[in-house]
Amino acid sequence: AETQAEVKRMLENPDKTELIECFYKDLEFGTGGLRGIMGAGSNRMNIYTVGAATQGLANYLNKCFKDKGQISVVVGHDCRNNSRKFAEISADIFSANGIKVYLFEDLRPTPEVSFAIRHLGCQSGINLTASHNPKEYNGYKAYWDDGAQVLAPHDTAIIDEVNKVTVEDIKFKGNKDLIQIIGEDVDKVYLDKVHTLSIDPEVIKRQKDLSIVYTPLHGAGRTLIPVSLKEWGFENVHCVPEQMVKSGDFPTVVSPNPENAEALSMAIELAKKIDADIVMASDPDADRVGMACKDDKGEWVLINGNQTCLLFLYYIIKNRIATGKMQ
């Protein structure tokens, strides 16, 4: 009914630009999956385009792993409008095709979705997210059994399968017996694994009072990042309260890209108020980080991705030299 109403509105509009844009082609399933504006039409993110992508992936999984036991997948999603609906529809379609589904109970960071695929021994997984794109967008990322995005030869083979699917082929009626809800059980294992990556826990102990301002920009980072920082030993973590609220409308930012100064404005404002040492922000699916710190004049400046990477690399090399692991 919702789709019919939207199409009817476009048909009745004398200006057919929107109608043409929504239907003039199929939303392309590429090597990274799907990404596009949400709405009715073959060139939009909706239950039918998401359904076709899931049906195509299910068909390919059943071809690849036929006679190899129960096939399973992980399904995750971010905070975006319709992400949960798309995730539940995808879970139904996978299960209707005989595939066991581990569906996260709520939004989770993309890295945890990748981890869960390996931890649970799944053959594939998907995450419903459009990363840091504006609120009108949503997306569909596909992963293989190693937790990484699908690579050759599977990527093009999946694309071929998706392109064969018609609306009539999509099995929307799920099998609830094959859908298992996951959440805190996987969170704990994931955070335990993340904490083993600490290069020198003693450094954290010495810097436990480091004043950190964090914002998830309304996204999935809110579920794990604050608790992870505290479990690691940082005792002075301050979250931007208005941006800890889950919302696909991203009401406090123009665009939820943590590398944009505008998106960090509220976090920097809080940092100035409490005299923090560093600002951290994550995008809606928490696989991209933006950072800011004070320069030698005490002014807050953004650290871009390249600079952040260099700082990490410098610290790793410095630590390995100090511990005799590198010359």
Model-derived regions, located:
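Gly/Ser/Thr-enriched, mixed-charge loops and adjacent short helices
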Residues: E18-C22, D26-L27, N138-A263
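Generic secondary-structure signature for well-ordered alpha-helical cores
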Residues: E12-K16, G39, N43, Q55, ...
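Glycine-rich phosphate-binding loop of actin/hexokinase-like ATP-binding domains
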Residues: I126, N138-I159, V289-K318
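A glycine- and small-aliphatic-rich helix-loop capping segment at beta-alpha/alpha-beta transitions
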Residues: I89-N97, L120, K141-Q149, V227-E235, ...
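Proline/glycine-rich low-complexity loops and linkers
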Residues: E105, V165-V186, D295-Q327
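An N-terminal, well-structured beta->alpha segment
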Residues: A1-S90, Q180-D209, A220
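N-terminal small/polar loop signature for handling phosphorylated ligands or for N-terminal nucleophile
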Residues: V74-Y137, E235-M291
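Well-ordered alpha-helical segments embedded in enzymatic catalytic cores
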Residues: T49-G56, E112, V189-K193, A263-M266, ...
